[in-house]
């Protein structure tokens, strides 16, 4: 909270961590940025939010599987630390943080990833068909994000170069 208040007081923008839910942005981040801005006699609407998003695209479950697994692993990794684990509790997924922390210490990466259910993934990522991805990004972040960064996209393109034009279409749709 302190750094969000400081950003509200002093900064032109905030680069949000990819491990976020809209609940976190709405109920934790934005109020603190607004408090800092108010303390400095600034308007918080002038502070830009750059938001990396775990975006998992594909026209079939099979096509999305690799990116879903990667996003779940990242969410589990970040969520295993106290700095991010509270977000699970905020969403009603109690005791996920301590479970992830224990599994991380044990080095059980398969169980770590399996702890992040599809329901949890949907809170921290956008999972969609290619044709729906831009609309889902816009629906979730319009009026909140100044910029969206699709996290893990470079990795996806590295695995599947044919996806580059599709990610380009999404970027154009989101920025238009």
For the regions a protein language model found, what residue spans apply to each?
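Active-site-adjacent structural elements that line small-molecule/cofactor binding pockets in enzymes
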Residues: 1-176
């Amino acid at each position: 909270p302190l750094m969000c208040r400081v950003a509200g007081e002093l900064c032109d923008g905030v680069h949000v961590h990819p491990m976020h839910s809209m609940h976190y942005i709405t109920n934790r981040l934005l109020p603190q940025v607004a408090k800092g801005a108010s303390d400095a006699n600034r308007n918080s609407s002038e502070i830009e939010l750059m938001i990396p998003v775990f975006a998992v695209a594909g026209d079939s479950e099979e096509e999305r599987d690799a990116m879903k697994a990667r996003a779940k692993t990242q969410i589990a990794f970040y969520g295993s630390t106290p700095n991010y684990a509270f977000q699970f509790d905020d969403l009603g997924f109690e005791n996920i943080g301590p479970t992830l922390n224990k599994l991380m210490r044990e080095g059980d990466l398969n169980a770590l990833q399996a702890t992040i259910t599809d329901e949890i993934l949907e809170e921290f990522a956008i999972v969609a068909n290619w044709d729906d991805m831009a609309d889902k990004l816009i629906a979730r972040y319009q009026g909140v994000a100044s910029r969206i960064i699709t996290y893990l996209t470079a990795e996806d393109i590295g695995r599947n170069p044919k996806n580059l034009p599709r990610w380009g279409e999404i970027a154009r749709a989101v920025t238009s």
